[in-house]
Amino acid sequence: MGEFNEYDDIDDFFCNDISPLHDEADEFGSTDIALPSQLYGKGPKPRAGESKALRDRNKESGSGTESEAKGDTLATKRGRSSWRRGASESSRSSSLGSSSPSDSSSGRSLSPVRPAKRKRTDEQQPESEANRFLAEMERDIELSAGPGGGETATGKGGRDTDARVYNVGFISRIEGSRNRRVNVKVTGQKQFATFLAIALAAFSKQHNIRKSLKPKYQADQVKIYREGVEVFKFMTCDSFNIEEPYNASATDIEVYIVPVDEATAFEQEWKRKFEERVRMLSNSSFLEVMDDIEDDNDDFLVNEYEKALVNARSLNETELAVREGTPADESSQLLKIVLLGSDNKKVFIHVRPTTTLLKVAEHYRVAKELPPTVQLSLMFDHEEIDLDDTICNIDIEDGDIIEVVVK
């Protein structure tokens, strides 16, 4: 009996389809079915009534049939294993054969594609460099817009355009720090939005603003004005196109911080004061210079356009006197004097020698926004002076200080 195989049961199940075996006694042949008992070497039980000789003959024929069946079974197994190996080899060969043309065809088809990919990479390289350059520019702008940033940008002639320095004087119109001043030194390319918050924080800290008023000291709750014109927060000091000083010193700029809800009233007030100032220039002999602003540097000069008007007016009067054949009047000379109030705040004005002290007192009343019911008296050299006198009668010189007493 052959060795036991775990796949014999499976083979026994498929062994019903065995090719017919020809017997010499049967010329037509007979189909033998390989039973499991024959494959495992177990013969059928003898039937009753069979003789011993018949059983021996059947046994001999059964052993022959069993050996032939075993041979057929082994041949069938070998055929199947060889067929499986052949099928696997043929499948591998077919797969290799089918892949080789595809590989070759794909290789041929990819050969023009690979240079195209490299070409696209080459085309994208300048674009990435451009994007990198733009990103660096944006980063430089953000750094220059920051509180301590500021990358130098080269202008015409290779000169640094942001090297110009400005002293920005913020004058507050906000409750809690009204008419107070904070100076901020910045470069010309910084936007007002970047250092406005610094000025507001300085006002709040310096004057101990109470908690209920601190919401008014936010950048979105105020507007900026320069000479009555609103300054947008994205603007810079260079946007004003102010002529640079000949010695390249810092340029002084004066702006007002006004609450949003008071902006309209401030514009109307500024317009009224400007019209009054023009009327005073045309009808009187003195010029308003400063407002009631507290500053460490009280000797702050007047606006450039007002000084230009004064100089032009004096020149015209002198030329008119020369044309008429008369000498130029000495009264056309302007003197700069200082009005000092009890609050130690200075108001600068330009007067002529023929200007009366009453007009000087009225100018102080307008500058301080005092009501008409308030009485004013002027003191010079610790003596009260008559308001009907003129500047030349009291021997007031350029730069003298006149004290103002409010009664």
Swiss-Prot record:
Its main location: cytoplasm. Residues 47-60 have a biased composition (Basic and acidic residues). Residues 19-130 are annotated as: Disordered. GO terms for cellular component: cytoplasm; nucleus. SUMO-like region repeats lie at residues 129-253, 334-407. Pfam families: Rad60-SLD (PF11976). Keywords: Coiled coil, Cytoplasm, Nucleus, Repeat, Repressor, Transcription, Transcription regulation. It comes from the Eukaryota. The keyword Nucleus applies. InterPro entries: Rad60/SUMO-like_dom (IPR022617), Ubiquitin-like_dom (IPR000626), Ubiquitin-like_domsf (IPR029071). It is found in: Cytoplasm; Nucleus. Residues 84-111 have a biased composition (Low complexity). Component of a cullin-RING ligase (CRL)-like complex composed of at least the cullin RTT101, a linker protein MMS1, and the potential substrate receptor ESC2. May be a substrate targeting component of a cullin-RING-based E3 ubiquitin-protein ligase complex RTT101(MMS1-ESC2). Involved in HMR and telomere silencing via the recruitment or stabilizing of the SIR (silent information regulators) complex. The 2 SUMO-like regions, although related to ubiquitin domains lack the conserved acceptor Gly residue in position 456. This is Protein ESC2. The lineage of its organism: Eukaryota, Fungi, Dikarya, Ascomycota, Saccharomycotina. The gene is ESC2.
